[in-house]
Amino acid sequence: MSDDTFSRIQSIVEEQLGVESSKIKLETDFQKDLGADSLDVVELIMAFEEEFDINVNDDAAGDIKTVQQVLEYIEAESAK
């Protein structure tokens, strides 16, 4: 895992959802732990796409629930 990638994800989540970065861990679930609704998650996905210059397809977007899943997806896409 890249600490830089995690830090960038953390910053996006902090900015988009208005939560403290200390609450954002790998196992953090956007909806259950941070109170995000489905629109918040869509906006997060769009912010990740822009920040990391990736495209998250609809199937993958529906499966992304935690910070760990975002990180793994970004790393897999970046390796292509």
Curated annotation (Swiss-Prot):
Post-translational modification: 4'-phosphopantetheine is transferred from CoA to a specific serine of apo-ACP by AcpS. This modification is essential for activity because fatty acids are bound in thioester linkage to the sulfhydryl of the prosthetic group.
Keywords: Chloroplast, Fatty acid biosynthesis, Fatty acid metabolism, Lipid biosynthesis, Lipid metabolism, Phosphopantetheine, Phosphoprotein, Plastid
InterPro entries, per database record: ACP, ACP-like_sf, PP-bd_ACP, Ppantetheine_attach_site
Principal subcellular localisation of the protein: plastid
Disulfide bonds: none
Molecular-function GO terms, alphabetical: acyl binding; acyl carrier activity
O-(pantetheine 4'-phosphoryl)serine modification, residue list: 38
Subcellular locations according to the entry: Plastid, Chloroplast
Role played: Carrier of the growing fatty acid chain in fatty acid biosynthesis.
NCBIfam families xrefs: acyl_carrier, PRK00982.1-2, PRK00982.1-4, PRK00982.1-5
Protein's name in the database: Acyl carrier protein
Organism in which the protein naturally occurs: Trieres chinensis
Gene symbol of the encoding locus: acpP
